[in-house]
Amino acid sequence: MIEYYIFYFVVKNYQAIYYLYLLTKKEILIMATAQTQFENFHSKILMGYDDNEPLRDRRDTLIQELKDKLSSDVPNMKFFHQGSYSLHTGINPLNGNPDIDIGIIFECDPNDEDYQNPLKLKKIVRDALNTKNRTVKIKRPCVTVEYLRDGEPIYHIDLALYSCEYGDSDGQTFLARGKETSSAEEIEWQISSARELTGVILNKYTDSSHKKQFRRIVRYLKRWKDEKLGHKNTPSIGLTVAAYELFSANFDFVTGKAQDLLALLSLVNSMLNNWGGDDRLHMYLPVEPFTDLFERMSDNQMKDLKTKLEKLSAVLIEARDQPDTHEACKLLKAQFGDDFPVPDKSETTKSSSSSVVPAGRSA
């Protein structure tokens, strides 16, 4: 054990001496990390579902209503959380109307004659929950319950309905797809492994600090999307899976502190480097049905996404190379919106909020 601590001390001091050497040789860059500001930004945009009592209460009410109102003729149900709630990557929406995604597994075989048409169960759920204090709509992937105040939406809950093979709720599940105006080809039970998706993504990171940085980076991208992309066809789950596939944790070599700016820059550049020969970004679900999460984006929307990612990359590089944290944060605020804090000029110095990297470090 003593030998270990001696070795650790020598290595750490060697690192410090090496950085001092590079500094004297002018082979090192002084840069603003803005880590404090990134973490403050994260605290502002973080959606803490368990702290959102009204939304949590409405979720519990809906689940209880379904248990109470559905007749005994309807197959047994099991509920589970999915989406950003289960991944802990949710953000406060810019214009309000936060949501929770709930999965409902009905213990029925999708080939059962009574439930071959997935719209049957969707209509049963809609009719059970349709009361005067909310609107309930059947959408292609789910049933959406929306709560209004003065005619404006304040919360919504998406209920994704599943059946299970052979009526075994632990077996393969199938998502009820289609709405009442869908064509016959669009109404189907689609094979889906939504329950497994959360574990696949989060189990990739065994280091808790890496997992926390992953979640922060996903939230930054989501808020950036809300600020910069006007179209809804860039799904948040696509950005989350892009991070799952391409994210690399980044921590200071000497101090061990997180460097979210560099981790985000690396991810954005990796996304751009993965643009295909068809001038599109393809990101596939890592579980069945392995769909391309960006397939519904038009070519113009895809072009817009690429252009704005290129701009984000350029701004992140400029902020990285900016020695003054105040100036760096002004650049970042233009990308991430008013919730990104900019410290007073008098509060920032090169020594207080900056880090060092060897010159020529790749973006």
Which positions does each model-derived feature cover?
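Conserved nucleotidyltransferase catalytic core and NTase-mimicking acidic/glycine-rich helix/loop elements
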Residues: S209-Q322, E327
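Extended, alpha-helix-rich binding/interface surfaces that flank or overlap catalytic cores
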Residues: I91, P153-R219, V357-A359, A363
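Terminal (often C-terminal) interaction modules
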Residues: I2-I6, V10-T24, I28-N40, D279-A363
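Extracellular structured ligand-interaction cores
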Residues: D101, R140-C142, I154-D158, V218, ...
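Conserved catalytic core of two-metal-ion nucleotidyltransferases
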Residues: E53, L66-L70, L87, L119-T173
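N-terminal regions immediately upstream of nucleotidyltransferase
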Residues: I2-N97, F106-K120, S362-A363
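Extended hydrophobic secondary-structure segments that form protein cores and membrane-embedded regions
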Residues: K78-G83, T144-E146, L239-T240
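Glycine-rich, often proline-containing surface loops adjacent to acidic residues and nearby aromatics
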Residues: P98-E107, A194-L202, R219, T240
